[in-house]
């Protein structure tokens, strides 16, 4: 099945390590768009951030935010869940670990907690979820710990975005660098891991870039365009 769209993680995939957008990735994205290949930004960040990034970067596809819990396309936002058990977990975390912190973006979020990974480790969060018998999962993105419902992930978000585009998810290639990109890999037709990605992501990739971070993201986009006959 021919790839007709590309979904891209943002942090670490089209950026420098400091999260600034990489010029080569920006050029590659605009090349893909000029060839009629829509780019979907897929991020754990807020829908507001993703919408702004899409405008500034110049992507035409839907944006998938909050690790799949929020989709925005043509000025319409769709939220796939709400938070309830997440707040139960957060209350218990604060009691036991007073120094634990959430992201400053939490007031804008509606689909999950984002906990700063320098204030607690993901295994501690997972143990507490199990102890409290909550129907939640904790995933380390490499930048933060995302806590959400099990059915909320980048894969389910991409599936919903594809409905809006009229595409089969197998017609999408996904590029990412974190553990939270695994769910995207499960639904798309072609998978690329950026060079600094964890071993488990690389093991499930069809292609691994030679370059890291945004330079690797650019390499991935050009690889897709060449492999599927766009250039």
Curated annotation (Swiss-Prot):
It catalyses: 2-phosphoglycolate + H2O = glycolate + phosphate. InterPro entries: HAD-like_sf, HAD_sf, PGPase. Keywords: Carbohydrate metabolism, Hydrolase, Magnesium, Metal-binding. The active site is at residue 9. Pfam families: Hydrolase_3. Substrate binds at residue 154. CDD domains: HAD_Pase. It comes from the Archaea. One of its GO terms (molecular function) is phosphoglycolate phosphatase activity. The keyword Metal-binding applies. Its cofactor is Mg(2+). Signal peptide: none annotated. Mg(2+) binds at residues 9, 11, 177, 181. Its EC number is 3.1.3.18. GO terms for cellular component: cytosol. Catalyzes the dephosphorylation of 2-phosphoglycolate. Belongs to the archaeal SPP-like hydrolase family. This is Phosphoglycolate phosphatase. It comes from Pyrococcus furiosus (strain ATCC 43587 / DSM 3638 / JCM 8422 / Vc1).
